Amino acid sequence: MPEFTHINGDKVQMVDITAKGEVKRMARAEGTITLRSDTVAAIRTGTVLKGNVLATARIAATLAVKQTPQLIPLCHQIPIGAITVDFTDTEVSITAEVTVTSYGRTGVEMEALTGVSVALLTIWDMVKSAEKDENGQYPVTGISDIRVIEKIKG
């Protein structure tokens, strides 16, 4: 059975990282939102009524990375060195990729994952009126495949 460092019996605790050495850390995460092709086209051409979808999602991802310890209770507050947010698209999807670097005692995976999640949620929020069907449902829209694709320590 794997060892869970955040659990001690029936108690939940923040892991003590004070004895760890400080090294450069990097994590890259990605995730995808599936949309109607007309919606992706509107994002590409900048004709979404709420404004520039990807610029807004980039800002939201950056803010989310910096707020991760307030959202995930056992995450350490760590100094963030850099945040990069990139988007790629297909005819029916947009993939967000967030890279976070730090120089510290613990990794930045949760920060990268949080950034990706909030970027994708922001995209959904900005285009939801175009994604709903006549019943107010989202038959096409979905967020998937959020994962860490690279991690470097040292």
Curated annotation (Swiss-Prot):
Involved pathway(s): Cofactor biosynthesis; molybdopterin biosynthesis
EC number(s) per entry: 4.6.1.17
Catalytic center residues: 125
GO biological process: Mo-molybdopterin cofactor biosynthetic process
Matching InterPro entries: Mo_CF_biosynth-C_arc, MoaC, MoaC_sf, Mopterin_CF_biosynth-C_dom
Annotated SUPFAM superfamilies: Molybdenum cofactor biosynthesis protein C, MoaC (SSF55040)
Role of this protein: Catalyzes the conversion of (8S)-3',8-cyclo-7,8-dihydroguanosine 5'-triphosphate to cyclic pyranopterin monophosphate (cPMP).
Subunit structure: Homohexamer; trimer of dimers.
Family: Belongs to the MoaC family.
The keyword Lyase is assigned to this record: yes
HAMAP family registered for this protein in UniProt: MoaC_A
Keywords assigned: Lyase, Molybdenum cofactor biosynthesis
Substrates-to-products reaction catalysed: (8S)-3',8-cyclo-7,8-dihydroguanosine 5'-triphosphate = cyclic pyranopterin phosphate + diphosphate
Any Pfam family hit: MoaC
List of residues binding substrate: 74-76, 110-111
Name this protein carries in UniProt: Probable cyclic pyranopterin monophosphate synthase
GO MF, any single term: cyclic pyranopterin monophosphate synthase activity
CDD domains linked to this entry: MoaC_A (cd01419)
